[in-house]
Each structure stands twice: as C-alpha cells, then as structure tokens.
C-alpha cells in the first residue's frame, strides 16, 4: 500500500489548516498500523510525502506563495518534479522496496529532515 500525504502531519501548518494537518497525521499512523498488522502476510505499507513539487496548478490558487522563500528553505535549491514522487512510489512498489514498510518517504529537496 502506498499513500500520498505530506509533512504537515509532522510539523503543523500556519494557515488555519488544522483539518489538513489532522488528516495527514492520521495517514501516517494508518501507514504504520497497516504495516504492523499486515506485514505477516507480506503486505507493505508506506507513505510518500512530497514537498515543493512543480506542477500545473491554478495560478490564482497560489498567487500568495513567495517562490523565493520556498526555495530558500530547500537544501536542493529547486522544486521537485512530479516524476520525483512517481519514482519514489515505483521504488516502493518494486522488488527493491519489498523490505521497506511503515515508513514515510519524504520527497522534498531537504526542506524537512528527520
């Protein structure tokens, strides 16, 4: 099982999005619970948590975002691409990821590190 979430569930968010933070934290917990409960059957459960990913979005929705401020927080000084997230999912779904379970894989250019 591969969930797509985000890191707000670990850090909170400042834009009155408690509902979003709660849902993401719940997703992280579900990922771990499924990994424990169903690992005995060979089922893996992980979450991929994207960060700043360049996608085709409605520009009006993100007009308040200061791109330079976002990029300054990244260890890798450019946004990721949708393919970066897809590659993480492919790794988890392939045989190469068969021993990875209960994890949150952060694809965020080093913005958030554990």
Give, region by region, the residue ranges found by the protein language model:
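Catalytic loop of short-chain dehydrogenase/reductase
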Residues: 2-26, 31-40
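Short C-terminal tail/terminal secondary-structure segment
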Residues: 11, 90, 101-114
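A glycine/serine/threonine-rich, flexible loop-to-helix segment
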Residues: 15-17, 40, 50-74, 84, ...
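Short alpha-helix in the Rossmann-fold core of NAD(P)-dependent oxidoreductases
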Residues: 23-24, 46, 77-78
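Short-chain dehydrogenase/reductase
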Residues: 31-32, 86-89, 93
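Short, small/polar-rich loop/turn modules that mediate ligand/substrate recognition or access, typified
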Residues: 39, 44, 100-102
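Conserved SDR Rossmann-fold cofactor-binding beta-strand/turn motif
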Residues: 44-54, 93, 106-108
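A conserved structural motif in NAD(P)-dependent oxidoreductases
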Residues: 74-85, 96
């Amino acid at each position: 099982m591969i969930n797509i979430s985000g890191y707000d569930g670990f850090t909170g968010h400042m834009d009155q999005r408690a509902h979003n933070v709660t849902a993401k934290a719940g997703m992280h917990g579900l990922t771990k619970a499924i990994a424990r409960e169903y690992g005995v059957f060979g089922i893996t459960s992980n979450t991929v948590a994207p960060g700043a990913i360049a996608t085709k979005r409605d520009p009006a929705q993100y007009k308040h975002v200061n791109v330079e401020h976002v990029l300054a927080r990244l260890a890798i000084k450019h946004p990721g691409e949708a393919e970066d997230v897809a590659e993480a999912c492919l790794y988890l779904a392939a045989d190469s990821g068969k021993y990875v379970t209960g994890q949150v894989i952060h694809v965020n250019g080093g913005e958030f590190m554990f």
